[in-house]
Amino acid sequence: MKFFLNTGRTIWQGEAMEAGKNLDLYVKAAGVVYINEEDMEKLGVKEGDKVKVKSEYGEVVVYVKKATERMPEGMIYIPMGPWANCVVKPDTHSTGMPTFKGYPGFYVEVEKTDEEFLDMRSLMRKKYIEAVE
């Protein structure tokens, strides 16, 4: 299914980032996608399932979390971090920060998957070390 991707900070992602990006707390806060209940039903997923999010820039496997705040149908939210970085526009405009927002029509494909979820270390190895070997 096609969804509009929104990204940004969350309280939990920020707190976990300060505690340490290699901790399970950070993985649980940033390696997720928030989806509203109606869209979860359409995708045939429940909280804790894995989905693959694909864009023209890349793809990533994340865990599903039910959106607890109002989110329109057709929109998903991935907290800012390495998992979101896999699918957002990589141009940093010399800031060192990817373009998480500010470009119209950013749609991604989302599908349920049994593929492996990559923790922080494995994700970095795949994206930045193995990619150049």
From Swiss-Prot:
It comes from the Archaea. GO terms for molecular function: molybdopterin cofactor binding; oxidoreductase activity. InterPro entries: Archaeal_lipid_biosynth_FwdD, Asp_de-COase-like_dom_sf, FmdC/FwdD_MopB-bd, Formylmethanofuran_DH_dsu, MoPterin_dinucl-bd_dom, Prok_molybdopt-oxidoreductase. Pfam families: Molydop_binding. NCBIfam families: FMD_DH_FwdD. This is Protein FwdD. The gene is fwdD.
